């Protein structure tokens, strides 16, 4: 009888210890050990236009959705989209015109989100340039043909009546194009911020009244079809990153300083861009797509689908974005 009592006491003691272990080391520690899907995510510029994915990465928004994201900088939107088409990356935030041009040529990719609804860039010139017509025959620095800087430069030149009258020179990436301007290899540069301390703003592209998304978040059709939850996680984390930028300024300034360091300027300047241009609800707007189609001479009905706002619209309908800005749980 005593032996039975001792045995029962031992069992109770073991049971109590087991319960204590469970409470001391809760289930979330085991959840954290679960394998996360590895994602390669390309971004195409060292620019505050990319800050949404930087903040999503730094704040852990991707990880909370089971995604281990490796951000890959590829200098120029056209090259980033080539990497997506070639299967080197799972997702890319790159030049909207490069995404649309690739789709029109048959690339099996689709845009699922964007970042701006107007061109948050300006035409910066050397101090001696006083009027737009002085750019006739002059050189303008861009990253690469097919990039956002290339496309917006052409938009501005068309508006100014200078299309085909100025030379566009490729320098490679955003930093390289800035250096080209500072070393006076170019008289002008279209960029989201001043390419150098002596640069003077001649035209603010945002004031031209042109609907335009600077970048589109694109994935392959195959990945979207086979891994819809992963794509939704990417988009939701990206939207959360934008919200965090706008609602947690001290943290946002640190992230901007970290990623924008190569280009100079102050974190406050970059933050002003974020709050002014990045859309809280980053839908792909048909009018912005139409701007690109007009520039590339595309008319008539399209044979392929360029964008799908299904994920963003669903997140809006579920109140996800509202909660982010009201301090609720995502």
List the model feature ranges, each with a label.
Residues 55-56, 121-130, 213-230, 277:
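A bilobed periplasmic-binding-protein/Venus flytrap-type ligand-binding module shared by bacterial periplasmic
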Residues 14-26:
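Bacterial N-terminal signal peptides
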Residues 27-31:
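Sec/Tat signal peptide C-region and signal peptidase I cleavage site
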Residues 1-12:
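N-terminal secretory signal peptides that target proteins for export/translocation
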Residues 226-304:
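Secondary-structure end/capping motifs
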Residues 32-193, 200-211:
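Short, glycine-/small- and polar/acidic-enriched structural segments
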Residues 97, 175-260:
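Pocket-lining segment of extracytoplasmic ligand-binding domains
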Residues 297-330:
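Conserved C-terminal helix/tail region of periplasmic/extracytoplasmic solute-binding proteins
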């Amino acid at each position: 009888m005593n032996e039975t009592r001792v045995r029962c006491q031992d069992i109770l003691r073991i049971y109590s210890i087991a319960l204590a272990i469970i409470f001391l080391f809760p289930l979330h520690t085991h959840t954290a050990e679960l394998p996360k899907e590895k994602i390669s995510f390309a971004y195409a510029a060292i620019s505050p236009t990319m800050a949404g994915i930087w903040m999503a990465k730094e704040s852990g928004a991707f990880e909370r959705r089971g995604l281990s994201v490796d951000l890959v900088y590829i200098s120029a939107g056209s090259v980033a989209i080539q990497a997506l088409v070639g299967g080197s990356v799972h997702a890319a935030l790159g030049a909207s015109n490069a995404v649309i041009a690739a789709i029109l040529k048959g690339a099996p990719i689709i845009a699922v989100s964007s970042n701006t609804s107007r061109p948050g860039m300006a035409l910066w010139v050397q101090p001696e340039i006083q009027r737009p017509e002085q750019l006739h025959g002059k050189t303008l620095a861009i990253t690469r043909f097919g990039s956002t800087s290339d496309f917006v430069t052409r938009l501005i030149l068309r508006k100014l009546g200078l299309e085909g009258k100025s030379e566009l020179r490729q320098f490679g990436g955003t930093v390289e194009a800035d250096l080209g301007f500072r070393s006076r290899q170019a008289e002008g540069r279209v960029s989201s911020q001043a390419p150098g301390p002596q640069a003077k703003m001649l035209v603010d592209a945002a004031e031209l009244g042109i609907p335009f998304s600077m970048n589109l978040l694109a994935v392959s059709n195959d990945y979207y079809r086979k891994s819809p939850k992963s794509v939704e996680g990417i988009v939701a984390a990206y939207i959360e990153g934008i919200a965090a930028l706008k609602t947690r300024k001290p943290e946002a300034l640190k992230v901007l300083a970290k990623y924008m360091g190569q280009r100079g300027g102050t974190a406050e300047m970059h933050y002003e861009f974020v709050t002014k241009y990045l859309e809280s609800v980053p839908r792909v707007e048909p009018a912005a797509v139409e701007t690109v189609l007009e520039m590339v001479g595309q008319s008539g009905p399209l044979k392929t689908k360029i964008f799908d706002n299904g994920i963003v619209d669903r997140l809006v309908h579920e109140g996800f974005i509202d909660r982010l800005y009201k301090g609720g749980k995502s």
